[in-house]
Swiss-Prot record:
<feature type="glycosylation site" description="N-linked (GlcNAc...) asparagine; by host">
    <location>
        <position position="83"/>
    </location>
</feature>
<feature type="signal peptide">
    <location>
        <begin position="1"/>
        <end position="17"/>
    </location>
</feature>
<dbReference type="InterPro" id="IPR013106">
    <property type="entry name" value="Ig_V-set"/>
</dbReference>
<feature type="glycosylation site" description="N-linked (GlcNAc...) asparagine; by host">
    <location>
        <position position="45"/>
    </location>
</feature>
<feature type="transmembrane region" description="Helical">
    <location>
        <begin position="210"/>
        <end position="230"/>
    </location>
</feature>
<keyword id="KW-0426">Late protein</keyword>
<keyword id="KW-0393">Immunoglobulin domain</keyword>
<feature type="glycosylation site" description="N-linked (GlcNAc...) asparagine; by host">
    <location>
        <position position="92"/>
    </location>
</feature>
<dbReference type="InterPro" id="IPR013783">
    <property type="entry name" value="Ig-like_fold"/>
</dbReference>
<feature type="region of interest" description="Disordered">
    <location>
        <begin position="167"/>
        <end position="191"/>
    </location>
</feature>
<protein>
    <recommendedName>
        <fullName>Glycoprotein BILF2</fullName>
    </recommendedName>
</protein>
<feature type="glycosylation site" description="N-linked (GlcNAc...) asparagine; by host">
    <location>
        <position position="116"/>
    </location>
</feature>
<keyword id="KW-0812">Transmembrane</keyword>
<dbReference type="GO" id="GO:0016020">
    <property type="term" value="C:membrane"/>
</dbReference>
<comment type="similarity">
    <text>Belongs to the Epstein-Barr virus BILF2 protein family.</text>
</comment>
<feature type="glycosylation site" description="N-linked (GlcNAc...) asparagine; by host">
    <location>
        <position position="95"/>
    </location>
</feature>
<dbReference type="InterPro" id="IPR003599">
    <property type="entry name" value="Ig_sub"/>
</dbReference>
Amino acid sequence: MTHLVLLLCCCVGSVCAFFSDLVKFENVTAHAGARVNLTCSVPSNESVSRIELGRGYTPGDGQLPLAVATSNNGTHITNGGYNYSLTLEWVNDSNTSVSLIIPNVTLAHAGYYTCNVTLRNCSVASGVHCNYSAGEEDDQYHANRTLTQRMHLTVIPATTIAPTTLVSHTTSTSHRPHRRPVSKRPTHKPVTLGPFPIDPWRPKTTWVHWALLLITCAVVAPVLLIIIISCLGWLAGWGRRRKGWIPL
């Protein structure tokens, strides 16, 4: 018995889910100024006689519909008293999907929208969408059924940027504040001191520098070598006279 109840609950839940998912009318979020398509659709194997789009959380809501699409008369805009432009277009050839187009969305468009879809020629094959019972043999098999779905349009306001204030200075010298003299950076003109051209910003190595470097190495290197050898010899005891040692 428990298994039967669970199975029945699963079947009822699946049927309810099928009811709620039959009409697709999904939420949309867009920035102000963007082009927005509010698409309401049902499966293409359904037969649609009328699709009505309106403002509000529930159908009607005391407001006129925005747009109506019918399978035989095409589409037309009623605008429902709103002062903004709309376009309604069939999306597919089977006339089971329409898009309400808002070319320049503003904060006035934000809110809930409803989509009422009227199905026609309901049959046993799609009987789960129709009001009928298996024991009835009447026109209720073919009765029209209206399904409703709602969505919410969220409009993100445009970011406002504060205007830049430009301050223009007059050329009059009577009110010009006194400015302290600013020391200027030395120019990049090289200074010549004798045979050595000196540029403090871009020093360049000349032949004079190389010649002085070679002379310095030639003079200083032997002197340093002699000093180093002498120090090593002194540390090693060279030249010291040892006891018992008589030089020849």
